[in-house]
Structure formats: structure tokens, C-alpha cells
Curated annotation (Swiss-Prot):
Subunit architecture: NDH-1 is composed of 14 different subunits. Subunits NuoB, C, D, E, F, and G constitute the peripheral sector of the complex.
GN (gene name): nuoC
Similarity annotation: Belongs to the complex I 30 kDa subunit family.
Top-level taxonomy: Bacteria, Pseudomonadati, Pseudomonadota, Alphaproteobacteria, Hyphomicrobiales
Subcellular location as annotated: Cell inner membrane
Stated role: NDH-1 shuttles electrons from NADH, via FMN and iron-sulfur (Fe-S) centers, to quinones in the respiratory chain. The immediate electron acceptor for the enzyme in this species is believed to be ubiquinone. Couples the redox reaction to proton translocation (for every two electrons transferred, four hydrogen ions are translocated across the cytoplasmic membrane), and thus conserves the redox energy in a proton gradient.
Keyword Transport: yes
Protein name: NADH-quinone oxidoreductase subunit C
EC number: 7.1.1.-
Any one cellular-component term (Gene Ontology): plasma membrane
Pfam family membership, one: Complex1_30kDa
Membrane topology field: Peripheral membrane protein
Originating organism: Allorhizobium ampelinum (strain ATCC BAA-846 / DSM 112012 / S4) (Agrobacterium vitis (strain S4))
The entry's keywords: Cell inner membrane, Cell membrane, Membrane, NAD, Quinone, Translocase, Transport, Ubiquinone
Gene3D superfamilies per UniProt: NADH:ubiquinone oxidoreductase, 30kDa subunit (3.30.460.80)
InterPro entries named in the record: NADH_DH_suC, NADH_quin_OxRdtase_su_C/D-like, NADH_UbQ_OxRdtase_30kDa_su, NADH_UbQ_OxRdtase_CS
Length: 200
């Protein structure tokens, strides 16, 4: 299988007109890297080229690397049913650099792009309806970013007295704790019942 993927990777690199920056085959999966400027043209090539035939979109997701200048990776997964092959396409972007929407090519990308925007804040230009999908309408921030607080900003609950959902500041029942991983629970010296069997 990896030999067929190597052949496909060479075909994409040689025939896409420089749209693919690099390609790797690892663990039986082909990954192609591109740029924000080339994503639309590369996806069009992958769909329309007879050798590729990636006509099904499986997923679009985001990854946050806060230490990078372009902190977000947008990862696309496609399927070519005739060839029974999958491909992963990656690109890097920043908070203020939008990615062209591929909804005109794959209408099924609509909700995937909305999810990536909702959870990571990756903007998609040309998207028909870029609004929140999983979080509430008034939600502030993007919860899968590494710098988003674990507790969030507000607590949402249903109040039975007013018969509606209410938003309140987060109230923790106990303080955050700094855990000492060199605690006395690690590496105990006392003997437990049954330990004498292991010593023999």
C-alpha cells in the first residue's frame, strides 16, 4: 500500500503545478502540505484529476500550536473511492490570515469549516454561513485553543425559577491546586500484602 501511496505522492507533486509543498507517507497514510494561497487550487486538482479522484471529503479539523508564528494547522481528509485511497492535506495559518472556503467544491465542507471556526477561530473566506456551530451564540473565545482557560469564562445552566437558561461567572468550589508530582504517593517504601511473592 505504501508503494502505491509513494506513486500517488509523486504524481501529485509532479502534476499539480507546484501547489504541493511537500508530501510524506507514514503509517500507511499520505500527507500533502500546501499553503493558504494554494489550497483551493490543490483541492480542485485532487478532485478533478483522473489519477487522484478524491471526490469525497471526510473531515476538516484544526490543530493549535501556540509556539509557532502561524499557530494553526487546518487539516483536510479526502477519500478516492475508485482507488480506495485517502489523503490528508495540511496548511498553516495564523489568527489574522483567513483560509479560502472549499464549500463551492465540496458542499459537505460547510459544517466542518464552521466547526473549525467555532472551536479554533480559523476564518474561512467565501463561506456561505460562517457562524457558531457547537457553542452558544453569545460564546466568547474559541474553546479548543491552547490558551483558552480550562474553566471557561461563564457558567451556563437552566434556572428553574426563571424558566430559562442563565449565564453566570464561573464559581469554583475549590481553588486551583498546583500538583506536586513527586508526592509521597509515588514510590512508596512500605510493603503491601502480596509483595513478598514478587521478592522471591
Amino acid at each position: 500500500m505504501s508503494e502505491a501511496l509513494q506513486v500517488l505522492a509523486s504524481h501529485i507533486t509532479e502534476n499539480s503545478g507546484g501547489l504541493a509543498l511537500s508530501s510524506t507517507v507514514a503509517f500507511g497514510e499520505l500527507t500533502v502540505t500546501t499553503t493558504v494561497e494554494n489550497i483551493y487550487a490543490l483541492v480542485t486538482f485532487l478532485r478533478d484529476d483522473a489519477r487522484c479522484g478524491f471526490i469525497n471529503i471526510i473531515d476538516i479539523c484544526g490543530v493549535d500550536y501556540p509556539e509557532r508564528v502561524e499557530r494553526f494547522e487546518v487539516v483536510y481528509h479526502f477519500l478516492a473511492p475508485k482507488q480506495n485511497q485517502r489523503i490528508r492535506v495540511k496548511l498553516s495559518t495564523s489568527e489574522d490570515k483567513p483560509v479560502p472556503s472549499i464549500c463551492p467544491l465540496f458542499p459537505g465542507a460547510d459544517w466542518f469549516e464552521r466547526e473549525a471556526w467555532d472551536l479554533y477561530g480559523v476564518m474561512f473566506t467565501g463561506h456561505p454561513d460562517l457562524r457558531r456551530l457547537l457553542t452558544d451564540y453569545g460564546f466568547e473565545g474559541h474553546p479548543l485553543r491552547k490558551d483558552f482557560p480550562l474553566t471557561g469564562f461563564v457558567e451556563v445552566r437552566y434556572d428553574d425559577t426563571v424558566k430559562r437558561v442563565v449565564y453566570e461567572p464561573v464559581e469554583l468550589k475549590q481553588e486551583f491546586r498546583s500538583f506536586d508530582f513527586l508526592s509521597p504517593w509515588e514510590g512508596t517504601d512500605y510493603v503491601l500484602p502480596g509483595d513478598e511473592k514478587a521478592a522471591k
